[in-house]
């Protein structure tokens, strides 16, 4: 019942937002495409599970530093620290790794979760990375149809997932640029402790709903670059996104 009520609420909010400002559609589409890319990446990496993954896991997490590096690399590739945290907990439950290794992986995952934000901040707002998405999607979809070869098909899902991520970032960036011309979110900026609490709560809520701190962070950076939120409020949103991403691990 709670999930249905949440879904109806989200639809109502989106419907109202589209009615108030049609330019919001591009931002929402960017978030949707970005999340679709994450799902595609997840499906791609699932294709490589099994004995090979377990053997690889033992070799790459036998020390604390290796566990830390493993968490960083896997989160960078999969673009989901929540997913890595849940998978780590399942590895612990299955006895594949010990507690110290699990802690190292989760620490690394929280470091790796910043890579998406660095990508957008360093390149996404200056370089048209959406242009790289098109060939990735084309080659990825071709590989996805290789049903007789599990590895190639998994690689296709991963390549298509990266393409969707880049395309989603491009849509969000362009959407906020157009959105700023018709509606100014900065008028709702709040300073002081009240603003910190409010925007942290918004960051938590957005991450829980989308199940992705990456999506929340990238959305925040795109909004900040378009002048739609203040720097202080953007920091609060980033804090909220990192708090919200821990909820999945706790539930797991």
Predicted regions located by residue number:
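Short hydrophobic alpha-helical membrane-embedded segments
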Residues: 1-10, 60-65, 109-110, 132-136, ...
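Transmembrane alpha-helices
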Residues: 1-35, 132-139
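Cytoplasmic-side transmembrane-helix entry/capping segments in multi-pass membrane proteins
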Residues: 1-6, 101-108, 128-135, 153-164
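Membrane-water interface regions at transmembrane-helix termini and the short interhelical loops
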Residues: 16-20, 120-121, 140-154
